[in-house]
Amino acid sequence: MDLPGPIHDFLLVFLGSGLILGSLGVVLLTNPIYSAFSLGLVLVCISLFYILSNSHFVAAAQLLIYVGAINILILFAVMFMNGSEYYKDLNLWTVGDGITSLVCTSILVSLMTTILDTSWYGIIWTTKSNQIIEQDLIGNSQQIGIHLSTDFFLPFELISIILLVALIGAIAVARQ
């Protein structure tokens, strides 16, 4: 959107604070229904960030897929679960939780140091042909496809790995 500078900056700060507060709500709230609503707030804020950066197609896809489908599915799953099982065990930290948090923290630190120390400009993931001129493309969806397969190949693959890990975690939780 073409907004004046102060309004654009205010919206960025407002959406950023909504994103941070919503993500803290997802992690820190003990009631899973409230956590799911906080996740919906986070996803809506991300969609509004896309609107501010003139990516209307991605914003609509974000709203339809994540907020409209996945977050509602999470809410239904949480509401159909027995709520009393969340409050039976008051022991917050076990040995397994401590080991898991230590392993996850070490993986996070190693990933952050690797990402920050890598010179990403020297890595050529795919060859971009010179015949593709972005101004001649018909719509935003073609530009998104080209950027996902060339410029944003690494983040796209990292997101697919994160989704795969989340799917495996959901299966493990469902088996318990």
Curated annotation (Swiss-Prot):
Q: How does it sit in the membrane?
A: Multi-pass membrane protein
What GO terms are given for molecular function? NADH dehydrogenase (ubiquinone) activity; quinone binding
Task: List, alphabetically, the InterPro entries matched.
Answer: NAD(P)H-Q_Oxidoreduct_6, NADH_UbQ/plastoQ_OxRdtase_su6, Nuo/plastoQ_OxRdtase_6_NuoJ
Q: Give the top-level enzyme category.
A: translocase
According to its UniProt record, where is this protein located? Plastid, Chloroplast thylakoid membrane
User: What keyword terms does UniProt attach to this protein?
Assistant: Chloroplast, Membrane, NAD, NADP, Plastid, Plastoquinone, Quinone, Thylakoid, Translocase, Transmembrane, Transmembrane helix, Transport
Role, per record: NDH shuttles electrons from NAD(P)H:plastoquinone, via FMN and iron-sulfur (Fe-S) centers, to quinones in the photosynthetic chain and possibly in a chloroplast respiratory chain. The immediate electron acceptor for the enzyme in this species is believed to be plastoquinone. Couples the redox reaction to proton translocation, and thus conserves the redox energy in a proton gradient.
By sequence similarity, the record places it as follows: Belongs to the complex I subunit 6 family.
Per UniProt, subunit arrangement is: NDH is composed of at least 16 different subunits, 5 of which are encoded in the nucleus.
The protein's name in its UniProt record:
NAD(P)H-quinone oxidoreductase subunit 6, chloroplastic
